[in-house]
């Protein structure tokens, strides 16, 4: 164990480090004499404070001690635990595996850090006008080190922490720290200890004295303050020891007046060793002597004349010299403290200067590189200028030639002006025809809407399932549920990709043991068998025997996978994200406004939005959806489920799902499309960014360069959708759609510059005839709700088929309805893309 005093010897830091103790001896000329201050008084004048290596953890303990010292001096004590692993070449090695020199250098650095930490504590004391000194030892156990310091130094008053500040509470009445409990139990009982936490006194262990500690508590009257002088050294070994110099009395001389019947006192010489540093320089020991009269049986008159006066003079002289030595020792302590502080400051300034010099060299090198690049750039520009001058001369020659051609072109331009007048008249005529066509188109759209409502009504007549598949077909399609064909798994069950009746499909195997399994199975069949929409997943059939649902296969994965770039999938561009948001909005409007069976999805999130090969989005997972009341206002449920981050807080508390619940989830999805960040607390982050004008920093850089105006418009629209009160959320069909549809149209036009030629010409899937697999020219809606090319569906019906080509379910009738709206959209797409 090594004890380090508050005044290190500056000249010996590099070798065997030596530090002076609390009380330093005086100068060499005044070391003989009696120091009349007892040990107990020196110890009682100080309050010892145990501090941690982290200033923040012990600052409150030190401040409490400063406020309750009563003007007494503070002594900071610290137990340093040497590291058993030495960092070397980017790694850490045990002490035994490293050279002794490297271990010694590392230990020196550790001690310098400890000094700097204790200096921070000293500055706190200095700011409050309290004198303080520092001391630390090196031990593997902190609590044993504190107890040993109390025993070795005879500490009477100690302040230390009862527990970490985070454990403090008003009800705290006992110690929480293992170290504090150990010190309270093992420390000498005559030491009074205050235990504090977060600036409050938690427990006080009062000092008591028993017979075993009487010698420790009451030093001999002959032991003066000089007995407290200590020599603290830093040994070469890892475990350190503290040494203390004690004064001893020996009988030296018998003084008598010549009478054989009278006794006289004896004179004893006490020798006090100075520190080892002075012994090495002098080669001899410095001793101090004092004369003490014993209380014999002889009377004062038995001494020779003048003996009392001579003794009194010597005692006064020794006392004066001891007092002077004490003052000089204190002055020397202050000087050494100041010298140590100045040396540490000089070292820090030197390191700062060295760092600044290195940075300046680096900046200079960077500047030289930049200058060299600028020179190369200047030469390149000069060469380009010469080339441009040559081209300019050539252009001047061409200009003269063109001027002659212009004169010839004037006559031609006159003729063209005449043709232009004719073209303007023709254009005006075409505009008139266009207005008439637009009027006819609007009328056709209204008729198509009416026909669509009739088609929706007809879908109610469909049977419960599209196609019944046998369990053997499901097993064959999934290769007996081969794990390599599994593409998804959750509490609902597993999803496999397979080939069923020569068609690639996705097969969801619901878990029949789940309490919600049969309910979700029946719910999805009832919902998806009665509706068709381009942005809602198509249910092809079911297998009641195996609780299986057969869907169309969408190879693009989920929107969640694409937002997180799962399996290194390419990120979605901002144009695709705007289009996907528009498609989801259209699907939700369809669900909410379907007069025959309006419903709320209830679990809208990116994981339930699937993408096909053309990144067309489709809603899925209708197992937890809820049918609305006939008035379309709400659906009362007591088991509202869903992902917390996307769940409407109002619906979660009331148990009532409304269309506004899907609006809230849609708003969170909009924010994720904008930022690419997790859904939890995303609305707060976007609102903060909008308020502080930092929205551009929050946008997902993987989506490309967002148009800031459109991005801000989307962000504010999404925040409105995420309002806590449902009445404040916008309507999807009137407000949200009017923002998204124009934005999709504008982004689609501008995005063609970035798309490849082949990708740009891919038709949307709802333009493709399910039979011919080509873009439809004359789309018609059949009784099964699907749209086909008129020629294809008529050929199907003429071949004596009375079932649906898609679902194999018997058709309720064979009438066909022309889909004018889809035909108009296909023609418009063909004009722009072919």
Curated annotation (Swiss-Prot):
GO BP terms: protein ubiquitination
Coiled coil start-end: 334-462
The Enzyme Commission number assigned here is: 2.3.2.27, 2.7.11.-
Where, in this chain's numbering, is ATP bound? 487-495, 508
* SMART domains, sorted: S_TKc, Ubox
Where do the segments described as Disordered lie?
A: 232-308
| Protein kinase domain span | 481-744
Under the heading SUPFAM superfamilies, the entry gives:
Adenine nucleotide alpha hydrolases-like, Protein kinase-like (PK-like), RING/U-box
Annotated U-box domain residues: 762-834
Q: In which pathway does it act?
A: Protein modification; protein ubiquitination
Q: Which residues form the active site?
A: 603 (proton acceptor)
Regions of compositional bias (Polar residues) in chain numbering: 243-273, 284-293
Please report a single Pfam family linked to this protein: U-box
Q: Signal peptide location in the record? A: none
Q: Which keywords does this Swiss-Prot/TrEMBL entry list? A: ATP-binding, Coiled coil, Kinase, Nucleotide-binding, Serine/threonine-protein kinase, Transferase, Ubl conjugation pathway
Question: GO CC terms on record?
Answer: cytosol
| Catalytic activity field | L-seryl-[protein] + ATP = O-phospho-L-seryl-[protein] + ADP + H(+); L-threonyl-[protein] + ATP = O-phospho-L-threonyl-[protein] + ADP + H(+); S-ubiquitinyl-[E2 ubiquitin-conjugating enzyme]-L-cysteine + [acceptor protein]-L-lysine = [E2 ubiquitin-conjugating enzyme]-L-cysteine + N(6)-ubiquitinyl-[acceptor protein]-L-lysine
Task: Give one GO molecular function term.
Answer: protein serine/threonine kinase activity
What CDD domains would the database entry show? RING-Ubox_WDSUB1-like, STKc_IRAK, USP_STK_Ubox_N
Q: Which Gene3D superfamilies match?
A: HUPs, Phosphorylase Kinase, domain 1, Transferase(Phosphotransferase) domain 1, Zinc/RING finger domain, C3HC4 (zinc finger)
Q: Which family does it belong to?
A: Belongs to the protein kinase superfamily. Ser/Thr protein kinase family.
| Function of the protein | Functions as an E3 ubiquitin ligase.
- Its protein name is U-box domain-containing protein 33
Question: What is the originating organism of this protein?
Answer: Arabidopsis thaliana
Gene that encodes the chain:
PUB33
């Amino acid at each position: 164990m090594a004890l380090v005093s508050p005044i290190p010897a500056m000249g010996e830091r590099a070798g065997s480090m030596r530090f002076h103790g609390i009380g330093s001896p005086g100068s060499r000329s005044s070391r003989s004499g009696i120091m009349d201050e007892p040990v107990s008084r020196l110890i009682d004048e100080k309050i010892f404070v145990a501090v941690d290596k982290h200033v923040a953890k012990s600052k409150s303990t030190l401040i409490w001690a400063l406020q309750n010292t009563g003007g007494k001096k503070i002594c900071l004590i610290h137990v340093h635990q040497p590291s058993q692993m030495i960092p070397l070449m980017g790694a850490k090695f045990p002490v035994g595996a490293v050279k002794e020199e490297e271990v010694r250098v590392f230990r020196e650095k550790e001690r310098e850090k400890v000094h700097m930490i204790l200096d921070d504590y000293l500055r706190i004391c200095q700011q409050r006008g309290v004198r303080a000194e520092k001391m630390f030892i090196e031990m593997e156990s902190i609590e044993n080190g504190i107890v040993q310091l109390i025993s070795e130094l005879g500490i009477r008053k100690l302040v230390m922490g009862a527990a970490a500040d985070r454990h403090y509470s008003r009800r705290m009445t006992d110690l929480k720290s293992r170290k504090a409990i150990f010190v309270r139990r093992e420390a000498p009982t005559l030491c009074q200890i205050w235990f504090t936490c977060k600036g409050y006194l938690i427990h006080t262990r009062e000092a008591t004295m028993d017979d075993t500690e009487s010698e420790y508590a009451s030093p001999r009257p002959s032991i003066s303050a000089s007995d407290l002088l200590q020599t603290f050294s830093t040994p070469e070994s890892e475990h350190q020891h503290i040494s203390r110099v004690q004064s001893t009395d020996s009988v030296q001389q018998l003084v008598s007046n010549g009478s054989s019947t009278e006794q006289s006192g004896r004179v004893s010489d006490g020798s006090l060793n100075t520190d080892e540093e002075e012994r090495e320089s002098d080669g001899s020991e410095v001793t101090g002597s004092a004369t003490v009269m014993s209380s014999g049986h002889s009377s004062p008159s038995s001494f020779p004349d003048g003996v009392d006066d001579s003794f009194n003079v010597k005692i006064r002289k020794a006392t004066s010299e001891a007092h002077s030595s004490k003052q000089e020792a204190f002055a020397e302590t202050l000087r050494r403290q100041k010298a140590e502080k100045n040396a540490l400051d000089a070292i820090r300034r030197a390191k700062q200067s060295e760092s600044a010099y290195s940075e300046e060299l680096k900046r200079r090198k960077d500047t030289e590189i930049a200058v060299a690049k600028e020179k190369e750039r200047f030469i390149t520009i000069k060469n380009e200028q010469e080339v441009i001058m040559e081209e300019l001369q050539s252009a001047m020659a061409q200009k003269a030639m063109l001027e002659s051609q212009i004169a010839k072109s004037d006559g031609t331009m006159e003729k063209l002006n005449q043709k232009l007048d004719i073209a303007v008249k023709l254009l005006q005529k075409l505009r008139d025809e266009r207005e008439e066509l637009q009027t006819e188109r609007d009328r056709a759209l209204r008729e198509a809407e009416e026909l669509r409502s009739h088609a929706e009504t007809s879908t109610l007549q469909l049977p419960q399932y599209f196609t019944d598949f046998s369990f053997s077909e499901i097993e064959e399609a999934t290769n007996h549920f081969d794990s390599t064909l599994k593409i998804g798994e959750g509490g609902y069950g597993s999803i496999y990709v397979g080939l069923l009746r020569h068609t690639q499909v996705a097969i969801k195997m619901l878990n029949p043991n789940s309490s919600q399994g049969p309910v979700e199975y029946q719910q999805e069949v009832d919902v998806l068998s009665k509706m068709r929409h381009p942005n809602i997943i198509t249910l092809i059939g079911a297998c009641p025997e195996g609780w299986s649902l057969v869907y169309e296969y969408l190879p693009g994965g989920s929107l969640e996978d694409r937002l997180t770039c799962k399996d290194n999938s390419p990120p979605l561009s901002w144009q695709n994200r705007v289009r996907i948001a528009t498609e989801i909005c259209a699907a939700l409007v369809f669900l909410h406004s379907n007069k025959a069976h309006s419903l709320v999805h209830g679990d809208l999130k990116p994981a339930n939005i699937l993408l096909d090969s053309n990144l067309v989005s489709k809603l899925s997972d209708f197992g937890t959806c809820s049918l609305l009341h006939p008035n379309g206002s709400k659906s009362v449920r007591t088991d509202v489920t869903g992902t917390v981050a996307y769940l409407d807080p109002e619906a979660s508390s009331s148990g009532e799902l409304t269309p506004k619940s899907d609006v809230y989830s849609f708003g969170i999805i909009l924010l994720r499309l904008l930022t690419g960040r997790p859904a939890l607390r995303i609305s707060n982050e976007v609102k903060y960014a909008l308020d502080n004008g930092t929205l551009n920093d929050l946008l997902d850089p993987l989506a490309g360069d967002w148009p800031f105006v459109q991005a801000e418009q989307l962000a504010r629209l999404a925040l409105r959708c995420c309002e806590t009160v449902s009445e404040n959320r916008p309507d999807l069909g009137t407000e949200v759609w009017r923002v998204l549809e124009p934005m999709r149209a504008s982004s689609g036009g501008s995005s063609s510059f970035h798309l490849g030629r082949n990708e740009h010409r891919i038709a949307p899937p709802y333009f493709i005839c399910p039979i011919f697999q080509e873009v439809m020219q004359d789309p018609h809606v059949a009784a099964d709700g699907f749209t086909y090319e008129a020629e294809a569906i008529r050929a199907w019906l003429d071949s004596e088929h009375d079932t649906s080509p898609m679902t194999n379910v018997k058709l309720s009738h064979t009438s066909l309805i022309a889909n004018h709206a889809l035909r108009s959209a296909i023609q418009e797409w063909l004009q722009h893309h072919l």
